[in-house]
Design a protein with these regions (language model features):
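Active-site neighborhoods and metal-handling regions in enzymes and metal-associated proteins
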Residues: 1-238
Length: 238
């Protein structure tokens, strides 16, 4: 998984550079597929029943599971790219949100807080720690800024399958105090949040989740290995 994680980190970085004003979502999707194949690996998301793409791409009020289509990126958009791959039978998953062109100070702060929230959550991914501690650390950062932590979707275990136990909510659940981390687990830890009400609705395509109130969203995700010495981010750029 470390080899796959390094490759996915590089792909994520290249897709961010590629996603400029005037580029379409489907162009990003095509680029992602080429990069995954050039790395000698396979797309992960297209193994999900009914989903036929290598990426999920969203902007602004759309948070996740967005089908890459002919939408064009404009200056001021907040773009989210979620991409996964399979290497030697193991899935890895990562997501980044970023502004394109001219974005506001408010938007920039919004993105910075998401990155901080994810960092605090990952720091809790230690042997013997609970899922509750991860969720609480994530949620605390968001609440301090009056942002909404998404409660309808979660992070997850990842490895031989794309979605595995445990589920890792963005909102702390006291019952998750009983779910303890063990050495060697790999987790897709993701912060999903909104500038307004975090309630989500699903588009007519039956995939794309977006905020009901139309507020701005973002998502940051890394695949993390739980080791005896602490968390190791497999999809972090080297």
């Amino acid at each position: 998984m470390k080899v796959g994680g390094t490759a996915l980190a590089q792909i994520k970085s290249k897709l961010r550079e590629f996603a400029q004003v005037g580029v379409s979502f489907i162009d990003i999707e095509k680029q992602a597929t080429v990069l995954i194949q050039e790395a000698g690996m396979q797309p992960s998301f297209s193994t999900v029943p009914g989903y036929h793409w290598s990426t999920c791409i969203m902007k602004n009020d759309a948070l996740c599971h967005g089908i890459p289509d002919n939408q064009i990126i404009a200056s001021g958009d907040i773009i989210t790219i979620d991409v996964g791959l399979i290497n030697q039978g193991y899935h890895l998953d990562t997501t980044i949100s970023f502004g394109v062109g001219e974005i506001t100070t408010k938007q920039r702060r919004f993105l910075e807080i998401g990155q901080k929230s994810l960092s605090k959550a990952i720091a809790c991914a230690k042997v013997g720690q609970s899922v509750y501690q991860i969720s609480r650390a994530m949620e605390k950062v968001l609440l301090e800024e009056n942002y909404g932590a998404v409660y309808q979707l979660t992070g997850h275990g990842v490895g031989k399958e794309l979605h595995m136990e445990p589920t890792i909510p963005c909102v702390a659940n006291p019952e998750d105090r009983r779910v303890r981390l063990t050495e060697g687990q790999t987790l897709a830890i993701e912060v999903m949040y909104s500038m307004g009400n975090p309630q989500l609705i699903v588009d007519a395509d039956e995939w794309t989740f977006r905020t009901k109130d139309g507020s701005l969203t973002a998502m940051f995700e890394e695949t993390v290995l739980v080791t005896a010495h602490g968390p190791e981010i497999l999809t972090k750029g080297r």
